[in-house]
């Protein structure tokens, strides 16, 4: 599934460029100049999810939802660590604040400094807490896709609030794109979790249990065949 990584990066770039089109309209080829900066995490998540769907549905012929359950936890770890890149680059921070949680930055051109909301830290910690909680709950999941829904709900909830603090948001009219997407995805995921919570679920229908049952049946069949030969 390594090919999904460049797929996610490409979608992260396209997502960013789509909402910053005025920068690229006169020279669309510059969309390829990714080293100049300009990617968005939501584009990466959407791209990775789409890549997983293609890989599972058309290549491996396995459960898309079951794989999304697994990679969702990986998403949270990746986002938790990846946000620290914003710290080292001194980017993607919030507005000026006097909060006890603040990050000091000095303008290299003027030599003046100020304290800002370290939104990278907020999101990193939010993902860490989410990973711990969802990892624990994943051991009691009742259906394929449940973990993925919890991830979407958790991340969307945090991002909807954190995005409102940032100074570098992508805008669509008067709306912060990622904030709207985060709130909408959180709401949809929560509704899905509530609806599915009231439906009966057979643990044997979990993809991992189906695979285990199939493997056990094949092993039993092989043992029976060997015993028959021995007779």
Regions found by a protein language model. Give the residues of each.
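A feature for loop-to-transmembrane-helix boundaries and adjacent hydrophobic helices
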Residues: 1-231
């Amino acid at each position: 599934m390594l090919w999904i990584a460049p797929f996610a990066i490409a979608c992260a770039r396209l997502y960013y460029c789509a909402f910053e089109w005025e920068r690229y309209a006169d020279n669309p080829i510059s969309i390829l100049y990714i080293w100049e900066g300009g990617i968005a995490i939501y584009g990466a998540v959407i791209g990775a999810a789409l890549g997983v769907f293609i890989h599972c549905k058309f290549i491996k012929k396995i459960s898309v939802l079951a794989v999304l359950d697994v990679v969702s936890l990986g998403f949270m770890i990746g986002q938790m660590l990846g946000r620290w890149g914003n710290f080292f680059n001194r980017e993607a921070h919030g507005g000026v604040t006097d909060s006890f949680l603040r990050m000091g930055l000095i303008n290299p051109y003027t030599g003046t400094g100020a304290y800002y909301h370290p939104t990278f830290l907020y999101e990193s910690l939010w993902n860490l807490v989410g990973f711990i909680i969802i990892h624990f709950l994943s051991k009691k999941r009742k259906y394929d896709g449940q973990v993925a829904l919890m991830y979407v709900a958790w991340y969307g909830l945090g991002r909807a609030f954190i995005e409102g603090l940032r100074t570098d948001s992508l805008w669509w009219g008067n709306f912060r794109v990622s904030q709207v997407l985060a709130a909408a995805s959180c709401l949809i995921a929560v509704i899905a979790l509530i609806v599915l919570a009231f439906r009966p679920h057979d643990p044997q229908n979990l993809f991992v249990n189906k695979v285990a049952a199939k493997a056990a049946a094949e092993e039993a069949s092989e043992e029976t065949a060997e015993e028959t030969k021995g007779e």
